[in-house]
């Protein structure tokens, strides 16, 4: 397969190296188009009013490009960095933190996969809980590439992508592989009011338990729940859902 690899942690991250190198070892043709800077929580932001500065970087077995832009920019630009203008799959990651539950709507990693899926490229976002070691990264990278191979020559529904997450424990401790729904557990935010040395008031996101990511209790069987219990989780995420039929009667006679 011709695989486009991107991420939101930047082209120098250990996660993207593990993922790209796993695809190269499996014999795939790989092109890396990744942000030059850390772009976590950029969601699907694209650049419209400034140029995208691109530098080719050395990478054994692949062509690699550092892009002064967002993860979604990197995906949109990817086909223009190769003469073929076509990819069979897009792998985004490995993100240095899980992307489960509502995090997928903020995540640059997940949004890069969504951007690819919008452009008719089958895609997968790959993430692992913070603190994972090298063996866990390499194991997850290999798993992601083998899972992508299952979809070689197939088309997922447009805008639908695979979201893969793993615990940060040694792979031998992983309890299994589960297809599951997203958790609806939301963040417990705590914005702390402070003053800088010049007396200017600012607010700093400091989670309820001293972390920027404190969560409500996840629902049993959801991705966050299963991750916390030691499972690798997989979800197929699509964007098109509305509740028009549920509320049609309420607004049937509304004329503005």
For each feature predicted by the language model, list its residue ranges.
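C-terminal accessory domains and tails appended to enzymatic cores
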Residues: 157, 167-256
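Hydrophobic/aromatic ligand-binding patch that stacks against planar heteroaromatic rings
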Residues: 22, 112-116
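Glycine/threonine-rich flexible loop motifs
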Residues: 98-107
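Short beta-strand segments
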Residues: 33-35, 92-95, 126-127, 164-167, ...
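Short, glycine-/small-residue-rich phosphate/pyrophosphate-handling segment
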Residues: 124-151
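Short glycine-rich anion-binding loops that position phosphate/pyrophosphate groups of nucleotides
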Residues: 9, 38, 70-71, 95-98, ...
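Short, Asp-centered acidic motifs that coordinate Mg2+ and/or phosphate
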Residues: 89
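A cross-family phosphate/adenosyl-ligand binding-site feature
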Residues: 3, 13-81, 85-86
């Amino acid at each position: 397969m011709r695989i486009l690899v991107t991420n939101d942690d930047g082209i120098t991250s250990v996660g993207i190296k593990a993922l790209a190198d796993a695809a190269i070892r499996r014999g795939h043709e790989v092109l890396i188009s990744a942000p030059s800077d850390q772009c976590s929580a950029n969601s699907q932001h694209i650049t419209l009013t400034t140029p995208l500065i691109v530098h080719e970087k050395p990478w054994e077995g692949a062509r690699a490009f550092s892009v002064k832009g967002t993860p979604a920019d990197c995906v949109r630009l990817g086909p223009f960095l190769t003469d073929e203008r076509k990819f069979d799959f897009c792998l985004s990651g490995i993100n240095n933190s899980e992307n489960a539950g509502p995090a997928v709507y903020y995540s640059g990693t997940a949004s890069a996969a969504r951007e690819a899926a919008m452009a008719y490229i089958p895609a997968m976002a790959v993430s692992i809980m913070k603190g994972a070691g090298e063996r866990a990264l390499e194991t997850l990278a290999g798993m992601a590439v083998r899972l992508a191979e299952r979809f070689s020559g197939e088309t997922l529904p447009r805008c639908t992508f695979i979201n893969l997450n793993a615990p940060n424990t040694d792979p031998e401790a992983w309890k299994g592989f589960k297809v599951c729904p997203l958790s609806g557990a939301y963040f417990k935010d705590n914005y702390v009011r402070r003053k800088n040395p010049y007396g200017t008031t600012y607010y700093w996101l400091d989670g309820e338990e001293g972390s920027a990511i404190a969560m409500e209790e996840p629902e049993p069987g959801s991705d966050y729940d299963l991750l916390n219990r030691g499972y690798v989780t997989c979800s197929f995420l699509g964007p098109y859902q509305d509740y028009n039929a549920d509320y049609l009667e309420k607004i049937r006679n509304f004329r503005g």
